[in-house]
A protein has these predicted regions:
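Globular "head" domains of long coiled-coil molecular machines
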Residues: 1-206
Length: 206
């Protein structure tokens, strides 16, 4: 399932494989995620059984958990609400919106690359970048590499371009290690468009 909160994948020796989840309600405080990392009691811990694929799947699914809340509650937590859902959360027929259950997740997983110090930060998209200043002010600028993944079937939007320009590859950020990736490119071969039309669409987005 799609990641619903910023998720760090790393390996920390001396700690068992586990997922640490920071409740979304912590957004109502002035404390940053980095500050909450000093208070382990604020996090929910889910053990990872690396010997069982089913157990791993069940545990990792927790990262994508959502819940329905009142619009006022979502707004207090920093979520934008939009009737059309283009630039924010779209209310349902009952006037409620779906928000992620967790503000941040840290997955401690034993893997040779992670054991060498690699840390992967997966963000759920534009909403997280706007709602969590740490991503734009600290974590993204200091990253050695950023993969900016775009959906080829929907095209590059103005919001995508703004994030790329302002937070990923702008004049005030490092230029090396910034890579844009077109995902879902296989969906362009729909049996209707010609090869030339598909090539033109890819070239336009690139």
């Amino acid at each position: 399932r799609t990641t619903m909160c910023p998720t760090e994948l790393l390996f920390e020796a001396g700690k068992p494989p586990a997922i640490e989840l920071l409740p979304i309600e912590t957004r109502s405080t002035n404390a940053s995620v980095a500050e909450f990392k000093r208070f382990p009691e604020e996090w929910r811990v889910v053990a990872l059984d690396t010997g069982s694929a089913d157990a791993m799947h069940s545990a990792l699914a927790r990262v994508g958990e959502q819940k329905r809340v009142a619009q006022e509650h979502a707004a207090k937590l920093g979520f934008a609400i939009e009737a059309d859902g283009k630039d924010g959360l779209r209310p349902d027929a009952e006037g409620l919106v779906e928000i992620p259950c967790w503000r941040h997740a840290v997955i401690n997983f034993p893997h040779p690359l992670l054991e060498q110090g690699l840390v992967i930060l997966d963000t759920p998209g534009l909403n997280a970048i706007g709602a969590e200043p740490e991503l734009t002010l600290s974590q993204l600028p200091s990253a050695h590499a950023i993969l900016f993944i775009l959906a080829a079937d929907t095209g590059v939007t103005q919001s995508d371009l703004a994030v790329w320009r302002d937070h990923v590859n702008g004049a005030r950020t490092r230029q090396k290690g910034r890579i844009a990736v077109l995902n879902k490119i296989d969906g362009l071969w729909d049996g209707i468009r010609s090869e030339a039309e598909i090539d033109a669409e890819i070239a336009r987005q690139v």
